[in-house]
Amino acid sequence: MKDKLVKAIAKDGQVRIIGAITTELVNEGVKLHNCAPTAAAALGRMLTAGALMGTTLKSGKDTLTLQIHGGGIAKGVVVTSYADGHVKGYIGNPTADIDPNSKGKLDVSGIIGKNGNLLVIRDMGLKEPYIGQVPIYTGEIGEDLAYYYTVSEQTPSAVGLGVLVDKDLSIKSAGGFIIQMMPGADEMLADLISYRLEEIPSITEMISKGMTIEEILEYIFEDMDLKILESIAPEYRCDCSREKVERAFASIGQKDLKEIYDEGKEEELKCHFCNKAYAFSHDEVGDILESYYSEK
């Protein structure tokens, strides 16, 4: 089934919903980083969350970056997303893997850790990006994002994220949703939705059964006048380039660049998001030094 993201409303706009199937997207990211099962689940949940949240950006030039650092062996997860649904990300330690939790599920919170923060960074081309930050609530990512929305943006929200890793380490199913109550929404409606979310199967189970994202949302919001407003094809896509990597290389500073140049060696840099390698010869390091740091 092709990945798909939809935006919707229910109950005459009292509820705002973003839902997506992200199996192919997550599979791409997990393969690029050669993730162990628990690391794959953590990265996959973050990629799915990024795809969902990125579509709330107003401009194609805006970016949304999610970071979670909890002191665990995952060594943090970083995801950057865009308004068109494309997303990229990495996990600090792709080999992070521990025994399943008490429910027999991949122990994402166990590798993320709980001693740290979740950050949401919106860069809208202004002088400074907007940074929202909350302490990690559980380390399961979905609950942490729901906590972020409630505390930092004062928007009561339910966030469901799921990644099912197959025996061959491929992604069998992945997806998620963000459900938000709009100002003035009926409190009994919020209670009803909470009850339904407790009763439904997991999103990965529904995707594995072949349900589309529209069918999943219709199932959750039965008799609530669900209206699909927009659909997008989310994808994993890195936009790195030699020029961007060169700028990042130059930013290490004149002193460090001079040391690298004086050693006379070729320098290789890898993109965090896609692992593509960029080699800079001794002469090219010299050119960067001259271009960025020579006195005009």
Swiss-Prot record:
Intrachain disulfide bonds: C238-C240, C271-C274
CC annotations in GO: cytoplasm
Top-level taxon: Bacteria
Pfam families found in the cross-reference section: HSP33 (PF01430)
A GO biological-process term: protein refolding
Family, as annotated: Belongs to the HSP33 family.
The protein's name in its UniProt record: 33 kDa chaperonin
Protein's organism: Clostridium botulinum (strain Loch Maree / Type A3)
